[in-house]
């Protein structure tokens, strides 16, 4: 993730990366373009949803999740150094945020690229409130959230959102570059993949060679 973010958002030399998947969340502190701390935690969009955020009492359950996450963040020493930095959000839930932001604040649904999209803290407050107060069906109908993500998106964004709360992070910058782009960046930097136009072509050729009898 670190290499992918540095390749996709090279201006983010000082930031806190938050990649929330289905069952895990990875945090990476970036200072002066280098890793200042990292940790992988065993909860994500699906696990938080299954445990706390299924239908019924969404608001109260969301507050329980937020309280638990704040306590977790207090146990990660390097996070104190992230105070005031931008949060770089990765993962499907983070990538869905710009579309919600545009619907809530610009009333637009036209196609656009979410990569590099900046969401200020007050907009994140409004997005979380909009999700908490809607059912999965309403999130799809009113906020444009994909049907397959509507039930888990709140669990997917609460880790990043509570980091913004706890450490006064002013904004979230959405990044669509992740592991694959990071691998490609390393390969290109080392000159290994110079003959290939992208990582997919590189991997496809590698798989073909590996399957060829020697």
Question: Model-derived features: where do they sit?
Answer:
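Helical "lid/coupling" subdomains associated with nucleotide-phosphate turnover
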Residues: 1-14, 29-214
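Short glycine/serine/threonine-rich phosphate/pyrophosphate-binding segments
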Residues: 1-2, 20-26
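A short, small-residue-rich loop immediately preceding and capping a beta-strand
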Residues: 16-18
């Amino acid at each position: 993730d670190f290499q992918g973010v540095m390749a996709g958002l090279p201006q983010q030399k000082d930031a806190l990366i938050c990649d929330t998947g289905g069952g895990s969340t990875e945090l990476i502190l970036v200072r002066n373009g280098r890793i200042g701390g990292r940790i992988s935690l065993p909860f994500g969009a699906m696990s938080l949803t299954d445990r706390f955020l299924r239908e019924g009492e969404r608001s109260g359950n969301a507050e329980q999740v937020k309280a638990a996450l704040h306590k977790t963040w207090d146990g990660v020493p390097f996070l104190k150094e992230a105070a005031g930095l931008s949060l770089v959000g990765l993962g499907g839930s983070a990538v869905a945020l710009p579309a919600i932001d545009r619907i809530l604040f610009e009333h637009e649904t036209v196609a656009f690229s979410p990569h590099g999209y900046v969401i200020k803290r007050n907009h994140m407050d409004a997005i979380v409130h909009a999700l908490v107060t809607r059912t999965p069906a309403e999130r799809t109908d009113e906020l444009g959230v994909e049907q397959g993500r509507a039930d888990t998106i709140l669990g997917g964004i609460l880790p990043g959102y509570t980091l913004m709360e706890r450490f006064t992070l002013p904004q979230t910058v959405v990044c669509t570059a992740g592991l694959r782009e990071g691998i490609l960046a390393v390969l290109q930097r080392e000159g290994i993949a110079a003959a290939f136009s992208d990582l997919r072509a590189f991997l496809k050729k590698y798989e073909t060679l590996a399957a060829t009898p020697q």
